[in-house]
Amino acid sequence: MTPSLSNFLSSLVWGGLIVVVPATIGLILISQTDRLDRKL
């Protein structure tokens, strides 16, 4: 694997983490604080 390719892949991984982790934390916090009655 070339250095530029490994840099590209690692930047993709870190970019995905930077997007996914805060979104997941935000969804968990919203679902914890939002106490509406959701009956399926």
Swiss-Prot record:
Membrane topology term: Single-pass membrane protein
Transmembrane parts of this sequence: 10-30
Keywords: Membrane, Photosynthesis, Photosystem II, Thylakoid, Transmembrane, Transmembrane helix
Domain of life assignment: Bacteria
Annotated InterPro entries: PSII_PsbX, PSII_PsbX_type_1_subfam
Cell location: Cellular thylakoid membrane
Gene Ontology process terms (BP): photosynthesis
GO cellular component: photosystem II; plasma membrane-derived thylakoid membrane
One Pfam family matching this protein: PsbX
Family: Belongs to the PsbX family. Type 1 subfamily.
HAMAP family: PSII_PsbX_1
Function according to Swiss-Prot or TrEMBL: Involved in the binding and/or turnover of quinones at the Q(B) site of photosystem II (PSII). PSII is a light-driven water plastoquinone oxidoreductase, using light energy to abstract electrons from H(2)O, generating a proton gradient subsequently used for ATP formation.
Quaternary organization: PSII is composed of 1 copy each of membrane proteins PsbA, PsbB, PsbC, PsbD, PsbE, PsbF, PsbH, PsbI, PsbJ, PsbK, PsbL, PsbM, PsbT, PsbX, PsbY, PsbZ, Psb30/Ycf12, peripheral proteins PsbO, CyanoQ (PsbQ), PsbU, PsbV and a large number of cofactors. It forms dimeric complexes.
Protein name: Photosystem II reaction center protein X
Name of the coding gene: psbX
